[in-house]
A protein has these predicted regions:
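Cleavable N-terminal export/targeting peptides
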Residues: 1-80
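Short glycine/proline- and aromatic-enriched beta-strand/turn motifs that initiate or cap beta-hairpins
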Residues: 49-132, 323, 329
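Residues on the lipid-exposed face of transmembrane beta-strands in outer-membrane beta-barrel proteins
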Residues: 85-87, 106-112, 150-156, 173, ...
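Structural signature of outer-membrane beta-barrel domains
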Residues: 88-92, 125-129, 176-180, 209-213, ...
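Outer-membrane pore/translocation modules
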Residues: 97-98, 120-223, 303, 308-322
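Detector for outer-membrane/organellar transmembrane beta-barrel domains
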Residues: 187-271, 275
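Predominantly the C-terminal beta-signal and adjacent terminal strand-loop region
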Residues: 272, 277-332
Length: 332
């Protein structure tokens, strides 16, 4: 009996010792696992802290990069130049004919610091009977200049955001040297102001002209239009089309100076125009346009325009004109 009790006590003691060891080993394993997890967590946290937060600084889009590059180019551009060579089917001024046959138009301008510019425009007659008619009679000037306009002015553009588009302002002075043939033909000086909003669906343009020398007349023209991209998109469009409508107004001095009315000013030429522009490359554009103009809103001035055009003879006895042109524009 005592022997069995001793064996039983011995077995119980062994079981307790084994259980204690298992508990001890389990605690050690748990401690090891916890320590390892803590070390891994610290390492992961340190690694994450060293890496840049990509979601906080996204990469700029291509459009943003292009806009930044364009802005840098504009800032770095101290001097720029542009030139134009084209042919117009008629010599039209204020909606009436100063030449019934085609003329060649050439101009060139140099701009400094994207503000001040200087340049000139020359018109050439290409036919024998296209000399500007009137009391001075310019005569046969085929292949010779008709006018030479020397210009200087200040022009700049400001981007006002998507709502207001781009504001463009141009103030310039023109000295117009005219051809001499019979008698003395006085030169003319002009002071002009243009303001327009671009990059909008509805693009308005206001042009104010003051004749400083010939008759001191004032002419104002308001134009509205929209540029549709036909090939490409936005400013990078390869081919665009712009339809527009413009209405001119002149005071009595302006209409008298052009022989339209001696004692009456008012609404003058109304013009509907369509213009195509093909951007051949970054520095070359081909431009073509067609236009129709008439004196719609003032009967007295319409009669004056009919008489002005009719002085060319033939079938020109009307107040309206249909004309067009094509040319190449270069920019550097």
């Amino acid at each position: 009996m005592q022997g069995r009790c001793a064996v039983t006590v011995g077995m119980l003691g062994g079981v307790l010792i084994l259980a204690a060891r298992m508990v001890y080993n389990t605690r050690m394993k748990l401690n090891t696992i916890i320590c390892a997890a803590a070390v891994c967590g610290c390492v992961s946290f340190a690694t994450a802290a060293d890496e840049p937060a990509k979601t906080e600084t996204p990469e700029p889009s291509k459009a943003e990069l292009a806009e930044e590059e364009k802005g840098e180019e504009e800032e770095d551009s101290l001097v720029s130049a542009e030139a134009y060579f084209g042919v117009d089917s008629k010599y039209i001024t204020y909606g009436v004919m100063d030449g019934k046959d085609p003329i060649v138009r050439m101009n060139g301008y140099v701009t400094f610091l994207d503000w001040w510019y200087i340049g000139a425009e020359v018109l050439f007659d290409v036919t024998k009977g296209n000399g500007k008619r009137g009391p001075y009679g310019w005569g046969n000037r085929a292949g010779k200049y008709t006018t030479v306009d020397a210009q200087t002015g200040l022009a700049h553009e400001w981007k006002l955001g998507e709502t207001l588009g781009t504001l463009s302002i141009d103030v310039y002075y023109t000295y117009e040297y005219v051809a001499r043939h019979k008698g003395t033909m006085n030169d003319t000086q002009y002071l002009d102001f243009e303001i327009k909003l671009k990059d909008l669906w509805f693009e308005p343009r206001l042009w104010f002209e003051r004749d400083l020398m010939a008759d001191d007349g004032t002419y104002v023209n308001l134009e509205v239009g929209h540029t549709f991209p036909l090939i490409g998109d936005g400013e990078d469009a390869t081919l665009t089309f712009k339809p527009s409508f413009a209405q001119g107004w002149g005071n009595t001095l302006r209409t008298r100076g052009y022989g339209l009315s001696d004692d009456h000013g008012g609404l003058m030429d109304a013009t509907i125009k369509g213009e195509l522009v093909w951007a051949v490359c970054d520095h070359v554009k081909v431009k073509a346009y067609i236009a129709y103009c008439d004196y719609w809103f003032d009967r007295k001035l319409r009669d004056g325009a009919r008489a002005y055009n009719g002085a060319w003879g033939g079938s020109n006895d009307h107040s309206w004109n249909f004309y067009g042109g094509v040319g190449v524009a270069l920019s550097f």
